[in-house]
Structure formats: C-alpha cells, structure tokens
C-alpha cells in the first residue's frame, strides 16, 4: 500500500488559473512580426514559421502592424496558435509616409515595455516575413 503523501508526490501537478505556473524568463518570449502587404502566404504557413522560430518558448505576446497582407496572416496565425496578439496600426493620416516606420519603432518600444514585466531572461524575437522597404525599418 502506498501512503497518500507519497502517492500525491507521484501525481502530476494540478494547476488552475488561480495558481499560475511561473516559468523561468528564458522560457518566455515576446515576438514582433511584420511583412509586406503583398504577401499571400496562408496563415498556417505563417504559424509554422512562428512556431519554429519560437523554439518551444512560451509566447507572451505577438505584436504586428495590422496592415493587409502579412500582418493579417500573422494575426490569423496568432489566433490559430492561441497567442495574445497586439495590433499596432499605423497613423497614416497623422504621419503620412513616415507612419509605417514610426509604427514599427512604436511596436519595438511596446515590446520592450512588455519584456520589462517578464522575468529576467525573457527574450524578444523580431521576425520579418518577405516584404517591402517598409519592413526593413522593423529591423
């Protein structure tokens, strides 16, 4: 006969929303992703690339530019993966042609704010899918 404390020690841990699992920082990640408006990859292919790039780490948030093309596919992929996504649309009327690069800088700044709330060692991953010159300002 196995004593209850020993049996309980062998049982897998039970976690609920009221008792979150704390992961080491190195296991957590924030992703900023973007690409061109003409990108026609299906969301499943984008999701595959995102999963491979995240390498099994827990993605706390994925930021994208909320534009047509790559950003729409990135948003759909994040939904498929169950990841929190943060849409960051450009303010075209306010900034004109500079709106895209300004938005990209704001996404990077926001991702650093998110990282500051995570344990030491959490990572930032910037992914640029095929795109235009505007995508380059994300890097």
Predicted regions and their residues:
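Acidic/glycine-enriched connector segments
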Residues: 2-139
């Amino acid at each position: 006969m196995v004593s209850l404390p020993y049996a309980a020690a062998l049982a897998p841990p039970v976690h609920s929303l009221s008792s979150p699992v704390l992961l080491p920082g190195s296991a957590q990640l924030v992703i900023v992703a973007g690409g061109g408006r003409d990108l026609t990859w299906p969301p499943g292919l984008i999701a595959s690339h995102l999963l491979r790039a995240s390498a099994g780490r827990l993605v706390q948030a994925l930021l994208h530019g909320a534009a047509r093309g790559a950003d729409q596919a990135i948003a759909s992929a994040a939904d498929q993966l169950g990841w929190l996504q943060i849409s960051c649309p450009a303010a075209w009327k306010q900034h004109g042609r500079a709106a895209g690069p300004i938005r990209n800088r704001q996404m990077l700044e926001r991702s650093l704010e998110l990282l500051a709330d995570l344990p030491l060692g959490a990572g930032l991953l910037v992914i640029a899918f095929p795109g235009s010159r505007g995508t380059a300002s994300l890097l």
